[in-house]
Regions:
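A glycine-rich helix N-cap at a beta->alpha junction
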Residues: 269-289
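N-terminal capping segment at the start of a domain
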Residues: 1-17
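Alpha-helical metal-binding/catalytic segments enriched in His/Glu/Asp
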Residues: 219-257
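Acidic/His- and Gly-rich active-site-bordering loop/insert found
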Residues: 34, 39-85
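Soluble metallo-hydrolase cores and metallopeptidase-like ectodomains found primarily
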Residues: 19, 54-60, 65-68, 137-220, ...
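Conserved small/polar residues in nucleotide/adenosyl-binding loops
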Residues: 390-399
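A generic, well-ordered mixed alpha/beta core segment in the N-terminal half of proteins
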Residues: 70-155
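Active-site-adjacent substrate-binding region
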Residues: 15, 181-195, 302-389
């Protein structure tokens, strides 16, 4: 079942670094060849390639058998809301409790992170002589927890409570007062060498699962947006298009605005397309013509109609889980879909026998944005924002 494939990928991808590493393995197993930014590798017709940036963003593409007439691009993101460790993270409380100093990453529902098993994963940079070497770590067998206060000490909690990020949402690492315990934990995974830097995140260590009376739902961490990531990679691998340049883009840092080296608000996509064009000796007219006939599908998630909060959905544009793929529109261009890209995508879905639903926010609720309108600010291409459905950005999404 495809849902179990998605869940397996998500379980193995606790951070963007792990997600990109796993994508590389999938692509390698399916005949893709890695090329490098700034490299002079030959780009050949009919071949399959990928390029990464900073270990947390990746673009894979399948070359047509001749000069491409257009591009079909799917863009998604591999980061999710969570907590990130600060430098020098160990805090000792009353000489008995070891906490980790964290800050929130992205838009969290804070209370959903309490009283559940959490783990640590990320990327560590090691000093190996004249080289700085990155190493992925995942302490999946180490359990941390952000403990709630007993209701007897906070009897008003069920009437609404605002948690203090600096004081009440720090994970408990363990008991005692050994401030070096965290460094020892890192070194146990990294081996010899001095640790120079790190990007470490808390994640929900409970594995994803299917749910519902007919297994029609997925309960999993990081559904936003790893389900779209996996689906787009799988679609690219199984593409048999001979005329278009087919491309899958996975960006990082969407949850915090995409303004990074590896985010959608960077030149990663544009520079990759230019690298391909240069490898094919495209002139400017051919290149601009290819762009004008291309389409970007921004594949992120949207809010399904919530059975407990039906009033939070738009009057008419209120999609339901498992009733078809969703096209998102917004007059303020938080989503990039316009009439043309809507019609174009609906035609594709009709030809494939796929039902379509429309999503729009209530007029009095701003809603979120996604990466489509950001990525096309660097490369002007028709874009449609589509999505699968989920119900909340929490450590255990539903979709």
């Amino acid at each position: 079942m495809f849902a179990n494939e998605v869940i397996g990928f998500i379980n193995d991808s606790p951070t963007p670094f792990h997600a990109v590493s796993n994508i590389k393995k999938i692509l390698d197993d399916n005949g893709f060849v890695e090329v490098y930014e700034g490299g002079r590798e030959e780009i050949r017709f009919g071949e399959k390639y990928y390029v990464t940036r900073n270990g947390s963003a990746i673009i894979a593409f399948v070359m047509p058998e001749g000069i491409p007439s257009s591009m079909s691009i799917v863009a998604s993101h591999c980061d999710s809301p969570c907590f990130k460790l600060k430098p020098e993270p160990v805090i000792c409380v009353e000489k008995n409790y070891l906490l980790l100093d964290t800050e929130k990453y992205g838009g969290l529902i804070n209370s959903t992170w309490l009283d559940r098993p959490l783990s640590l994963a990320g990327r560590v940079f090691m000093d190996y002589g004249n080289k700085i070497v990155p190493k992925l770590v995942d302490f999946k067998d180490v359990r941390l927890v952000i403990p709630n206060l007993a209701i007897h000490m906070n009897p008003e909690i069920n009437k609404g409570y605002q948690y203090n990020l600096q004081k009440e949402l720090l994970p408990l690492l363990g008991m005692g007062n050994d401030r070096d315990s965290f460094d020892k934990l890192l070194k146990s995974a990294c081996g010899a060498g001095k640790i120079l830097g790190m990007d470490m995140f808390l994640y929900n260590s409970e594995p994803g699962t299917v749910a519902g009376i007919d297994n029609e739902l997925i309960l999993s961490p990081r559904l936003d947006d790893l389900e779209c990531v996996y689906a787009s990679v799988d679609a690219l691998i199984n593409s048999d298009n001979k005329d278009k340049l087919c491309m899958c883009c996975v960006f990082d840092n969407e949850e915090v605005g995409s303004k990074s080296l590896q985010g959608a608000d960077s030149d990663f996509l544009l520079m990759t397309v230019k690298k391909i064009a240069a490898g094919l000796n495209m002139d400017e007219q051919t290149f601009s013509g290819m762009l004008s006939r291309s389409m970007v599908v921004s594949a992120d998630n949207a809010h399904a109609l919530h059975p407990g909060y039906t009033e939070k959905a738009d009057t008419n544009n209120r999609p339901v889980i498992n009733e078809g793929i969703v096209i998102k529109k917004n007059s303020s261009l938080k989503y990039t879909t316009d009439g043309f890209s809507e019609a174009f995508f609906k035609k594709i879905c009709k030809n494939a026998g796929i039902p379509v639903q429309m999503f729009a926010n209530r007029s009095d609720i701003a809603g979120g944005s996604t990466l489509g309108n950001i990525s096309i600010s660097h490369m002007s291409v028709h874009t449609v924002d589509i999505c699968l459905l989920y119900t909340s950005p929490s450590p255990r999404d539903r979709g």
